[in-house]
Amino acid sequence: TLMGGALKVPGNVTPVTEANINQDPEAADEVFRSNLPLTMIGLDVTTRTLLTKEDTKKWRELGTVAGEKYADITDYYIDAYKVTRPHLGGCALHDPLAADAAVDPSLVDTIYLNMKVDTKGAYAGRTIGDETRINDEARQTQAAVNVDKERFVKTFMKHLTDLFAQN
């Protein structure tokens, strides 16, 4: 399971590239073409799993150092999103969703698709179906296209709130 890419939504670095893939499109392309079974948790689903200042307020209300510090860090991230992605209304839980989906694949709905990453030109870093393997019966990548966001965010908040309550 990897966090990276954007299949049907705009990128977060350029209109077509997601930040993790954008760092090294050639390496990402090798991974997608490796014939390893992969699950791609991209912006299509991660930008639906949001934390808001209402969530961080719950951590502050715990009255613990951990709750206060993590609320500060997350609020900073939320404020950054107000500049870069104001339409979202919070900060996306990119990596936590990928980690949780690796443990509980039922969190996401996927489609099977052989993927590639464009490595040259204006679209370098774009994750897209590989037209040279479109008819291959063996499809190696499950690209997440939907997420049970309520269940994920509720579980995420419960785990962290319980942890922060202790410290």
Regions found by a protein language model. Give the residues of each.
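Conformational coupling and interaction surfaces
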Residues: 22, 26, 41-167
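Active-site histidine-anchored catalytic micro-motif
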Residues: 1-47, 53
